[in-house]
Amino acid sequence: MTTKGILGKKVGMTQVFTEAGELIPVTVIDTTPNVVLQLKTVENDGYSSVQLGFDDKRQVLSNKPEQGHVAKANTNPKRFIHEIRNVELGDVKVGDTIAADIFEAGEIVDVTGTTKGHGFQGVIKKDGQRRGPMAHGSRYHRRPGSLGAVINRVFPGKKLPGRMGNKTVTIQHLEIVKADTENNVLLVKGNVPGAKKSYLVVKSTVKNTK
């Protein structure tokens, strides 16, 4: 199955009316034209993909390897670089640009982003566990519960206090409401992971759309 995708930046959320008068929430994604930085093929790399670059970085903020990587594409160093796998390469070559017009209204996509970070949190906020009795005699309010008396170790993945958020998350099966080619903007129905100005990857959905 071939895939198409583009990199973007989350602008925020708004709402639009459909022709039937239905009000739907949408996320605005800035998809300033991406630059093709590298092409990978099955013969050379073992898989096929297109490496895209998004959001220019000033030369003074980039090092020599970053400048050399984009030299063949004749563009500025990029802040966000990502590969889209299983792409039908066709006539695509290094230095080409990919814009929002690769998608159309009604298409179904998967959006990947980095969730908001919330720092070190307890199990009530982080995992939704219940608190203990709040009476005066109780000494157990918001702490984690007992880990048990038999097993002498903690299993990996046990829900305990720790860092919350700042993880890569993919929201699947979102509908594109509008692809604004003039302003290089995609309107996606619903919400997507991450804070405003965070980077996103928009790809064709991997699941059956029936």
From Swiss-Prot:
A Gene Ontology biological process term: translation
InterPro entries: Ribosomal_uL3, Ribosomal_uL3_bac/org-type, Transl_B-barrel_sf
Keywords, sorted A to Z: Ribonucleoprotein, Ribosomal protein, RNA-binding, rRNA-binding
Protein function: One of the primary rRNA binding proteins, it binds directly near the 3'-end of the 23S rRNA, where it nucleates assembly of the 50S subunit.
GO cellular component: cytosolic large ribosomal subunit
Domain of life: Bacteria
Family affiliation: Belongs to the universal ribosomal protein uL3 family.
Subunit details: Part of the 50S ribosomal subunit. Forms a cluster with proteins L14 and L19.
Gene3D superfamilies cross-referenced by the UniProt entry: 3.30.160.810, Translation factors (2.40.30.10)
The keyword Isomerase is assigned to this record: no
Pfam families (alphabetical): Ribosomal_L3
Protein name in UniProt: Large ribosomal subunit protein uL3
GO molecular function, one term: structural constituent of ribosome
